[in-house]
């Protein structure tokens, strides 16, 4: 959202425009040469862009949809702006990775949803859109990259539909379409917490000093869900100077 990605497109000679509600970042991006509207992306803003600049051949939205409660509102905005032959590419946290890797700590207040292909495909179909390709990324533990176009006029990407079906089958095989899978996962997570607490307490009793490595937001999720306190961790280190010399939320480590 600081214009880094769009700069590459601009360097290739394309017209670019950013949209981000963080006014300080939008201002910085604009000053660096990437015009960025300090707005929330929605249908109204999308229609204004289409009116003033024309429809977009490419719309990118990387790791921002999870921060927005109204996913269908995003889709309405994309429909108002996307050219009939255009492609919308977005990245979101992939539930298959979150589940298979046990990344429950990435589920916190800023991440209101995680996605799988099967329900996304049905959602887009109801809006006259379709997924034409998918990919996976290791960013933030595992991300899903979707390529979406209009149902009737989307470009064809070689191997795209095969990739879509492959992930749909993988999701079903992992049991992600079954609620019982997540009840079992919850029990497994809680058991892991009990084992971790026992391990830390045992180390402390033997005279060990235990330090936390890294202070991301997900660390707070982990500490609260596993009830880790000052008695368990002496302190936490992080190379981000903005976090140094402070304490963790609530636990005050």
Predicted regions mapped to residue ranges:
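A conserved beta-strand element that flanks and buttresses the S-adenosyl-L-methionine
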Residues: 57-60
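Conserved S-adenosyl-L-methionine
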Residues: 129-140
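Short, glycine-/aromatic-enriched active-site segment of Class I SAM-dependent methyltransferases
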Residues: 88-113, 117-120, 124
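Flexible, glycine-/basic-rich loop-and-beta segments that form/coincide
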Residues: 140-188
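Class I SAM-dependent methyltransferase SAM/SAH-binding core
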Residues: 2-45, 231-246
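A solvent-exposed beta-alpha-beta segment
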Residues: 30-32, 201-253
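A short glycine-rich, Lys/Arg-flanked "PGG" loop and its adjoining helix->strand segment in the class I
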Residues: 72-89
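Short amphipathic alpha-helix with an adjacent loop that forms part of the alpha/beta core around
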Residues: 44-54
């Amino acid at each position: 959202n600081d214009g880094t990605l769009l700069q590459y497109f601009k360097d290739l000679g394309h017209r670019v425009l950013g949209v981000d509600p963080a006014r300080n970042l939008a201002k910085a991006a604009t000053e660096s040469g990437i015009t960025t509207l300090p707005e929330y992306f929605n249908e109204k803003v999308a229609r204004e862009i289409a009116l003033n600049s024309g429809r977009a051949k490419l719309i990118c939205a990387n790791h921002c949809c999870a921060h927005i409660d109204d996913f269908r509102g995003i889709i309405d905005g994309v429909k108002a702006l996307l050219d009939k032959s255009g492609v919308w590419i977005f990245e979101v946290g992939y539930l298959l990775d979150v589940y298979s890797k046990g990344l429950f700590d990435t589920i916190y207040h800023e991440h209101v949803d995680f996605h799988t292909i099967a329900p996304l495909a049905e959602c887009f179909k109801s809006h006259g859109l379709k997924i034409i390709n998918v990919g996976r990324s290791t960013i933030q533990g595992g991300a899903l990259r979707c390529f979406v176009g209009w149902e009737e006029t989307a470009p064809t990407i070689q191997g795209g539909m095969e990739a879509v079906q492959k992930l749909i089958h993988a999701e079903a095989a992992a049991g992600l379409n079954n609620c019982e899978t997540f009840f079992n996962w919850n029990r497994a997570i809680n058991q892991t917490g009990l084992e971790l607490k026992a391990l830390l307490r045992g180390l402390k009793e033997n005279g060990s000093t235990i330090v936390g490595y890294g202070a991301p937001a997900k660390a707070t999720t982990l500490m609260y869900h596993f009830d880790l306190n000052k008695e368990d961790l002496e302190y936490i280190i992080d190379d981000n100077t903005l976090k140094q010399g402070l304490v963790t939320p609530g636990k005050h480590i």
